[in-house]
UniProtKB/Swiss-Prot annotation:
GO biological process, one term: positive regulation of mitotic actomyosin contractile ring contraction
Gene for this chain: cnaA
Family recorded in the similarity comment: Belongs to the PPP phosphatase family. PP-2B subfamily.
Keyword Repeat: no
The species this protein was found in: Emericella nidulans (strain FGSC A4 / ATCC 38163 / CBS 112.46 / NRRL 194 / M139)
One Pfam entry name: Metallophos
CC annotations in GO: calcineurin complex; cytoplasm; mitotic actomyosin contractile ring, intermediate layer
InterPro entries on file: Calcineurin-like_PHP_ApaH, Metallo-depent_PP-like, MPP_PP2B, PP2B, Ser/Thr-sp_prot-phosphatase
Catalytic residue positions: 173
Self-association state and partner proteins as the record states: Composed of two components (A and B), the A component is the catalytic subunit and the B component confers calcium sensitivity.
Protein name: Serine/threonine-protein phosphatase 2B catalytic subunit
Class of enzymatic activity (EC top level): hydrolase
Swiss-Prot/TrEMBL cofactor(s): Fe(3+); Zn(2+)
Length: 549
């Protein structure tokens, strides 16, 4: 045998050298591990800009717009002082503006952006260079999308450059309550700090509430209010605060036209907005009465996703012009709506709608989680399942062969006083093995709860159960696309996220209660898993008896 061993060692083949700089893909393609596989996608900008890069070379008191545009496009971040300067400088300009802006045509009107920075860049391609084009944005720059702070910083930088040709109104998401509930606060803390978030909240309170365009159109984010009789009512609002949950300021940000606008079955001008959980639905007669009283042509608003990016409502009897128009400028909203976006260009008394589609963008896991936080519950559940499968070494016949036991198979053995325990005894070892196996079963159920929570952490949730169909997120983007097939499906599924959210304390309370119920259910299922209990008992009984000498 020694001779064979020596011969095997002498004839041992050398370990082949592996070139780890090359990787063979599933289709046989060789790619370099030292380069980006998808070369047309730029690498993220890892370095924060110097002051020379940040400030414009020709206007050293203003940020370099071209640099910011490309830097944000590559997911770059600014220093905290640079970001804070943009927000605070923009805030000072916004504070100087009245509640009700007035501007003339030509102008391009834009709806919700919702943190879709890459689509915002497409918007400027379609609408025109801000250096040469007048813009009015109707609010909702943040939340839901994962590039909200980039949208704020770039739009505020544009406001610094073009204070008299680019205007920003407030949307219902520009407030502390919604940004805390959705994604913007988390995004600010992840990419910058809470200091940047607080500066943004202060700036949001300075945003004007409405605009009159060309003395013909009232432009607002939400809609009309029973407290809005004349334009003077808007001028008297104290806007420098968190929006209230009722009243004129709330309605300007939250109200919607009735779903059957123009074909109402009620004579009421305003009814409670059951979809939003606050404010009102306003009717066609209410819109016509307001327009006629204020000598206006139409109300231009945003606030609602539209399949085509816009919607023209019923025309008024006196002017033949749409009484209300909705503009929505976030294409493929939440990456599942499959909607077009639109901007409204008004020039020489001619109104044109320009539509555009979504632009590819980098992917973020829900709530800015890293891959380990996201995947650990999935991995943990599978590992514990594998461990239970390994422990289950008994045949079907063995499991059916009941072993006498004085303790219920569904319950772990009760602890024994340590001063009376013989740790070398067979009974002690059997109890320990049995309890450990049952603990693994409970751990498996806990990981299942955590995995379900990970699946549920998505911006698009079903009204039934608060999440997409089980397993959808494990299937990736294709699974989501199959679950949500069209715009109307997505809109119905997402209705609960269009409501005024509950308070922070209520959200925490509900979350803790849901987790407690889920963990109790997991504990109950584990304790009543007769198969696992039988395996635990059978394995523990295989420990040989020990005899004392």
């Amino acid at each position: 045998m020694d001779r064979n061993l020596a011969r095997a060692v002498a004839d041992k083949q050398p370990v082949p050298e592996i070139d780890f700089t090359l990787h063979v893909m599933e289709d046989g393609t060789q790619v370099s591990t030292l380069e980006r596989v998808v070369k047309e996608v730029q690498a993220p900008a890892l370095n924060k800009p110097s002051d020379d890069q940040f400030w414009d070379p020709e206007e050293p008191t203003k940020p370099n717009l071209q640099f910011l545009k490309q830097h944000f496009y590559r997911e770059g971040r600014l220093t905290e002082d640079q970001a804070l300067w943009i927000i605070q400088a923009g805030t000072q300009i916004l504070k100087s503006e009245p509640n009700l802006l007035e501007m003339d045509a030509p102008i391009t009107v834009c709806g919700d952006v919702h943190g879709q920075y890459y689509d915002l860049m497409k918007l400027f391609e379609v609408g025109g260079d801000p250096a040469e084009t007048r813009y009015l944005f109707l609010g909702d720059y943040v939340d839901r999308g994962y590039f909200s702070i980039e949208c704020v910083l770039y739009l505020w930088a544009l406001k610094i450059w073009y204070p008299n040709t680019l205007w920003l109104l407030r949307g219902n998401h520009e407030c502390r309550h919604l940004t805390d509930y959705f994604t913007f606060k988390l995004e600010c803390k992840h990419k910058y700090s809470e200091r940047i978030y607080e500066a943004c909240i202060e700036s949001f309170c300075a945003l004007p509430l409405a605009a009159v365009m060309n003395k013909q159109f009232l432009c607002i984010h939400g809609g009309l209010s029973p407290e809005l009789h004349t334009l003077e009512d808007i001028k008297s609002i104290d806007r420098f605060r968190e929006p209230p949950t009722h009243g004129l300021m709330c309605d300007i940000l939250w109200a919607d036209p009735l779903e059957d606008f123009g074909q109402e079955k009620t004579g009421d001008y305003f009814i409670h907005n059951s979809v939003r959980g606050c404010s009102y639905f306003f009717s066609y007669p209410a819109a016509c009465a307001f327009l006629e009283k204020n000598n206006l042509l139409s109300v231009i608003r945003a606030h609602e996703a539209q399949d085509a990016g816009y919607r023209m409502y019923r025309k008024t009897r006196t002017t033949g012009f749409p009484s209300v128009m909705t503009i929505f400028s976030a294409p493929n909203y939440l990456d599942v709506y499959n909607n077009k976006a639109a901007v409204l260009k008004y020039e020489n008394n001619v109104m044109n709608i320009r539509q555009f589609n979504c632009t590819p963008h980098p992917y973020w896991l829900p709530n800015f989680m890293d891959v380990f936080t996201w995947s650990l519950p999935f991995v943990g559940e599978k590992i514990t399942d594998m461990l239970i499968a390994i422990l289950n070494t008994c045949s079907k016949e063995e499991l059916e062969d009941e072993t006498p036991s004085t303790i219920s198979p569904a319950e772990p053995s009760p602890p024994m006083p340590m001063d009376t325990v013989d740790t070398e005894s067979t009974e002690f070892k059997r109890r320990a093995i049995k309890n450990k196996i049952l603990a693994i079963g409970r751990l498996s159920r806990v990981f299942q709860v955590l995995r379900e929570e990970s699946e549920r952490v998505t911006e698009l949730k079903t009204a039934a159960g608060g999440r997409l169909p089980a397993g959808t997120l494990m299937l990736g983007a294709e699974g989501i696309k199959q679950a949500i097939t069209n715009f109307e499906d997505a809109r119905k599924v997402d209705l609960q996220n269009e409501r005024l959210p509950p308070s922070h304390d209520e959200v925490v309370r509900r979350s803790e209660e849901e987790r407690r119920i889920a963990l109790d259910r997991a504990q109950h299922e584990a304790d009543n898993d007769t198969g696992l209990a039988t395996v635990a008992r059978r394995i523990s009984m295989k420990i040989p008896s020990t005899t004392r000498r």
